[in-house]
Amino acid sequence: DSTSDQHEWFLEAKKAAKSEYSNRYIFTKSVWDAPPQYRMMCGLCERDGNYMVNYFSSQPALNYGFHEITHPEWQLPCDHPDCLATAEAMKDVMRFWLDKGADGFRVDMADSLVKNDDDKIATAKIWRGVRDMLDTEYPNAAMVAEWCNPERAINNAGFHMDFYLDHYGNGYSRLFRYGEFGDQAVFNPNGKGDIKAFADEYLPNYEKTKDNGYISFMTNNHD
């Protein structure tokens, strides 16, 4: 979803001179163009434009394209050659580490590749391409998504596993940390928790995905 702002790709992309990396990241057309619905970093590049980050300022977003184009002057479609090149470059990164002996990948912010992709259809298509590559070239490798939507991550995008994140109030968090002081959690010894809140969320997701992959429970920080 992103690289470091010190990555050699980004150091080339932020230059004013055009190169094969100019569209590797998402830049606006002008430094004065910073739509508020996106996280943008302003005034840090030689080129005229602001760059999008996925979260922190040091995480420039890789450009896999936009599913819905709202600013055609700088947004590229998913099938643009430069966006396709980004996906292929990331496959090469994966091949590098798999050839070194890695067993697979935990994928940060797995649902965030393609922008303006509310239903994650275009994002899932990219991950399906990655899964096809793994099945063909590295059949023993596995991927786990930081997604917390197993139907999309496993059934649609092809992940082997999807993290069940403990978002406050969801079924998983109700097991361990719920209520102002954690006193409404299922495993709190006071016995006030309700296992049904967990079961009602988990079991339907399990039934939908059990033949295709695994819902992965974290035992510590998801990172």
Language-model segments: residues:
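Active-site-proximal helices and loops of the catalytic beta/alpha 8
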Residues: 2-33, 92-93, 103-215
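Structured loops at beta-to-helix junctions and adjacent beta-edge loops in soluble globular domains
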Residues: 56, 65-67, 146, 166, ...
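Catalytic grooves of carbohydrate-active enzymes
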Residues: 95-98, 219-223
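Sequence-level motif detector for i,i+2 pairs with an aromatic at +2
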Residues: 50, 57-59, 160, 212-214, ...
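The substrate-binding groove and active-site-proximal loops of carbohydrate-active enzymes
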Residues: 58-87, 110-122, 181-196, 223
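Active-site-adjacent "subsite" loops/lids of carbohydrate-active enzymes
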Residues: 3-100
